[in-house]
UniProtKB/Swiss-Prot annotation:
It comes from Gorilla gorilla gorilla (Western lowland gorilla). This is NADH dehydrogenase [ubiquinone] 1 beta subcomplex subunit 9. Accessory subunit of the mitochondrial membrane respiratory chain NADH dehydrogenase (Complex I), that is believed to be not involved in catalysis. Complex I functions in the transfer of electrons from NADH to the respiratory chain. The immediate electron acceptor for the enzyme is believed to be ubiquinone. The modification Phosphoserine is found at S85. The modification N-acetylalanine is found at A2. Transmembrane segments: none annotated. The keyword Transport applies. Mammalian complex I is composed of 45 different subunits. It is found in: Mitochondrion inner membrane. Residues 136-162 are annotated as: Disordered.
Length: 179
């Protein structure tokens, strides 16, 4: 799974939905032919729909526990993992193709005109970055002791309305994959 939050923070509905999605993904690994997969997916959906409106939370929790145990015994030993998903064969392999953000400065105005909202927002970020750069560097110099570690996590903003130092790369991300 890409991200598994602690179970105590999920609502009952979220737990059921995640179990349903995991069960369908494992069913895809068992049923390669699409028509058979669809048939068994409909049967599984019907089983989940049977207890959709269960009012007694104790019974609903017990049903969820039993369903998770059944999933554990019926899960596929080698489930299909999409290549770009965490654990997939191509996960995070495209770092060499990620274009640095500054390359967008060289775009022709006609290219920028195709994405007016993005470039308008980008110009606002650039302006804010130019205005806050000196303050950010000064704050970092004040908070970093001489000879201290230079690789620590960045300190948070200290004043109301200020941005954390060197925030620029947090809010702008390169493309995930090449076109």
């Amino acid at each position: 799974m890409a991200f598994l939050a602690s179970g105590r923070y999920l609502t009952h509905q979220q737990k059921v939905l995640r179990l349903y999605k995991r069960a369908l993904r494992h069913l895809e690994s068992w049923c390669v032919q699409r028509d058979k997969y669809r048939y068994f997916a409909c049967l599984m959906r019907a089983r989940f729909e049977e207890h959709k409106n269960e009012k007694d939370m104790a019974k609903a929790t017990q049903l969820l526990k039993e369903a998770e145990e059944e999933f554990w015994y019926r899960q596929h030993p080698q489930p299909y993992i999409f290549p770009d998903s965490p654990g997939g064969t191509s996960y995070e392999r495209y770092d060499c193709y990620k274009v640095p953000e500054w390359c967008l400065d060289d775009w022709h105005p006609s290219e920028k005109a195709m994405y007016p909202d993005y470039f308008a927002k980008r110009e606002q970020w650039k302006k804010l970055r130019r205005e806050s750069w000196e303050r950010e560097v000064k704050q970092l110099q004040e908070e970093t002791p001489p000879g201290g570690p230079l690789t620590e996590a960045l300190p948070p903003a200290r004043k109301e309305g200020d941005l954390p130092p060197l925030w620029w790369y947090i809010v702008t991300r390169p493309r995930e994959r090449p076109m």
